[in-house]
Amino acid sequence: MKISRREKPLYALTIALMAVYFVLGCGIFDDYGCGPDEGIERQTSLVNFRYTIERLRLPVPDRWTTFLAYLPDLKEYRDRYYGTALHQPLVLIEAMGNFTMPARDFYRMRHFYTFLNWYAATIFFYALIRRRFGDPLTALIGWLILVLTPRFFAEAFYNNKDILFTAWTIFSLCTVDRWIQRKTVRSALLTAAVLALTVNTRLNGLAYLPIAIAIYFISALRTKEKPRVALTQLLLIGFLFLIFLIAITPNLWESPLPTLIETFRFSAAHPNHSAQGNLFFGKLIDASLSRRYVAVWIALTTPTGYLILSAAGLILFFFETFRRRKTSEPRPSQRSDLLALTIGAVPLLYIVLRHVTIYNTWRHCYFVYPTIVYFAAFAVNRSISKLRAVPSPNVRAGMAGLAAACLIAMIGESGVWIARNHPYQFAYFAPPARPNAEAFSGDYWQLPDRKSVV
């Protein structure tokens, strides 16, 4: 992508901000406590590691065998349906030290690893917005909104399930968009691998494959793509996805189809350990029974300005889509917008309408946040386009200054709050919700207490 002379300072600023965020993450990843999921995820990863060694008959040191012998067999393990492919590199690092790593060190390692995944995802998100709108300023603002969201800022270090899934949702969004655009074997291979890792991280990701196929099919119909080419691509992506998913999920190795069906059943009847344990408007409720639960929590814990921008972007998207509905040739940008919308909305609607079990606030639905930020960037881009079209230089400069001041105030407020409340950004409530924050769940993971233990 060619960079114009006018854009070079903006790119330099973007690179500098990304570098600052990375250095900051490297400096503060040890400031956060440990949630209960981290220990559980480590044990599940070790159980899968043991099964892999035994099933493939890999030669390993006796000290590994002795350590792993105390773990249950995967097929009898209660959490066997949870994938751990993304955590296996951490198990290998522990194994290199014969599993003698102190608890503090492997928790620190996991925090840093979770941050690396999230950091990479933010860069991919920037690239997605840059490619979609062709404007580096829009991409930078979108990136800043994603990074400077208080709860995500904190959980990017210790939430090794929901944040990892959100990060890989972004990777999936980027690779699917590129696959539909390029239609090559290489892009199909990469997309299938990313989708498989996303599904392995959380079964909700299984919705992404049919969404990708449906949008590819719609795009193929509107562009009058040859049926044989389209069918080949769809069969290829489906086949590669299954191969990758089975390969990285040891629980599927013996009987892939029956075990996959068992996994679906387990997910549908998932035990609700937090039933009647979610403080919501001053009452303890079962979150899965309230259809407004997720929406309310999103409104409570996301900076209000971000949500207003996103709502405006969504309205503009539908307006532009219906205005162009008679256009014979679709724009690639419309495909990207539809993909971003459906990848967030479809799984969310399923969870809400089917009363799927939800634990603690809306963290099980964090995957929808990239969609929220995407349409906030949509609104920003349309505003920038309107400003650039103003004929009068003086009026244009005045309006641009006002818009810039509003954006700086909005994003800056979140950034200042993050800095002042470090490392307790997980307790963030949007300004309108703060007077009633005590009526809702707070530190459900007891992170401050766990920090003192570790």
Indicate residue ranges for each PLM-predicted region.
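Loop-to-helix entry region of an early transmembrane alpha helix in multi-pass inner-membrane enzymes
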Residues: R80-Q88, F99-I123, E155-N159, L309
